[in-house]
Amino acid sequence: MKFYNIFVFVALILAITIGQSEAGWLKKIGKKIERVGQHTRDATIQGLGVAQQAANVAATARG
């Protein structure tokens, strides 16, 4: 029973400490992930444009 009380107390102290700390490192990781997503989106849009142009050229060549 004492172990449970000590565990709850330590967990509470850790939660308070972590909650008040700045989430700078987490924010940096989030921004990097967001940037990768944006680059992937932009590359996909550009690739679709090139594929559409190639399809138009192929359709024009067939007559």
Swiss-Prot record:
Annotated InterPro entries: Cecropin, Cecropin_insect
Signal peptide: 1-23
Effect on the protein of changing K2N: In strain: M31
Keyword Signal carried by entry: yes
Residue numbers bearing the Arginine amide modification: R62
Keywords noted in UniProt: Amidation, Antibiotic, Antimicrobial, Immunity, Innate immunity, Secreted, Signal
Biological process annotations from GO: antibacterial humoral response; defense response to Gram-negative bacterium; defense response to Gram-positive bacterium; innate immune response
Keyword Signal assigned: yes
Cellular location(s): Secreted
Origin: domain of life: Eukaryota
Coiled-coil intervals: none
GO cellular component: extracellular region; extracellular space
UniProt similarity note: Belongs to the cecropin family.
Function: Cecropins have lytic and antibacterial activity against several Gram-positive and Gram-negative bacteria.
UniProt cross-references to PANTHER family, sorted A to Z: CECROPIN-A1-RELATED (PTHR38329:SF1)
Protein known as: Cecropin-A1
Gene: CecA1
